[in-house]
């Protein structure tokens, strides 16, 4: 099962692959069941996996920065 394939959620590169896969499924109604579009599907899943790992890395970095910010008391300028 794929994640939400809405265009606003993905990079342009992945959107191109998503659209190619959708076109392949549309043009090959029966052959898609016999693996005709599998290469496009693999490439799309690879792209989505890369997006996911990049988002996860950014989120971890952001979380670590927020934890550091909350655990370190701010310097008082007046004293």
From Swiss-Prot:
Pfam families: Cmc1. A motif (Cx9C motif 1) lies at residues 14-24. Its main location: mitochondrion. Residues 50-79 are annotated as: Disordered. It comes from the Eukaryota. Residues 11-55 form the CHCH domain. It is found in: Mitochondrion. Belongs to the CMC family. This is COX assembly mitochondrial protein 2 homolog. The lineage of its organism: Eukaryota, Metazoa, Chordata, Craniata, Vertebrata.
